[in-house]
């Protein structure tokens, strides 16, 4: 089974967590694209979706799924999204697709966060994948200096502008043993919008696509 086939298996497995008659929170990325494909098969059973990115919104609309503004709804029963890394505590690094801020907001609203991944995303210690930090453009160098004081090596992801009009610093060289503490520490730097650590709002269920099928954790 290829990596993409494992992603597809995880994406389709998430369908069983979708509650008919509700609005579904939808994340961003290659694995989520498979979930959107699956969600389209039951689009007449849901009331629509809230999306974490322009790209996912466009894909949902292509299937005729109504996309709501998060400000227009009171609650989400479920949010389905991928991860770049996840550990045994279900802490995650997300944001490889630069949608981390909107992903974190939608995840905060949802009653349940379903993380869909292939088996290459599970790690013992977070940090091999660069940690994305969304930053107000004028604060780029200041934030980079502050991150270096914490032991990280930030690199500007040149040419990338988030859906919110900000930039991304990818932080390398950090073995993240206390994800909750670092999440707060980074968010406390003036100019940081948010960072890609999802520790305070981690996953409730993890669906892992493997060569032998989907494992639920």
Swiss-Prot record:
Reaction(s) the record says it catalyses: aldehydo-D-ribose 5-phosphate = D-ribulose 5-phosphate
Annotated S-S bridges: none
BP GO annotations: D-ribose metabolic process; pentose-phosphate shunt, non-oxidative branch
Record keywords, A-Z: Isomerase
Annotated pathway: Carbohydrate degradation; pentose phosphate pathway; D-ribose 5-phosphate from D-ribulose 5-phosphate (non-oxidative stage): step 1/1
Entry GO CC: cytosol
Cited InterPro entries: NagB/RpiA_transferase-like, Ribose5P_isomerase_typA_subgr, Ribose5P_isomerase_type_A
Domain of life where this protein originates: Bacteria
Catalytic residues identified in the record: 103
Enzyme class: isomerase
Binding sites annotated in the UniProt record for substrate: 28-31, 81-84, 94-97, 121
Subunit architecture: Homodimer.
HAMAP family: Rib_5P_isom_A
Assigned protein family: Belongs to the ribose 5-phosphate isomerase family.
NCBIfam families recorded: PRK00702.1 (NF001924), rpiA (TIGR00021)
Function recorded in the entry: Catalyzes the reversible conversion of ribose-5-phosphate to ribulose 5-phosphate.
Protein name, entry field: Ribose-5-phosphate isomerase A
Lineage start: Bacteria, Pseudomonadati, Pseudomonadota, Gammaproteobacteria, Aeromonadales
């Amino acid at each position: 089974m290829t990596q993409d086939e494992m992603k597809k298996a995880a994406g389709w497995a998430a369908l069983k967590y979708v509650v008919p008659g509700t609005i579904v929170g939808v994340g961003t990325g290659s694995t989520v694209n498979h979930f959107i494909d699956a969600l389209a098969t039951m689009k007449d059973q849901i009331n629509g979706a809230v999306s974490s990115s322009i790209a996912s919104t466009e894909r949902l609309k292509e299937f005729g799924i109504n996309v709501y503004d998060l400000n227009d709804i009171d609650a989400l029963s479920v949010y389905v999204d991928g991860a770049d890394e996840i550990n045994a505590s279900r802490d995650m690094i997300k944001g490889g697709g630069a949608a981390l801020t909107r992903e974190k907001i939608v995840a905060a609203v949802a009653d349940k966060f379903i993380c869909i991944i292939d088996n290459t995303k599970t790690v013992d210690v977070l940090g091999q994948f660069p940690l994305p930090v969304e930053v107000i453009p004028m604060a780029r160098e200041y934030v980079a200096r502050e991150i270096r004081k914490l032991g990280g090596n930030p690199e500007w992801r040149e040419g990338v502008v988030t859906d919110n009009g900000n930039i991304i610093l990818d932080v390398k060289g950090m073995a993240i043993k206390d994800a909750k503490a670092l999440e707060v520490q980074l968010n406390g730097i003036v100019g940081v919008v948010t960072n890609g650590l999802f520790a305070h709002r981690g996953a409730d269920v993890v669906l892992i696509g493997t060569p032998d099928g989907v494992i639920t954790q």
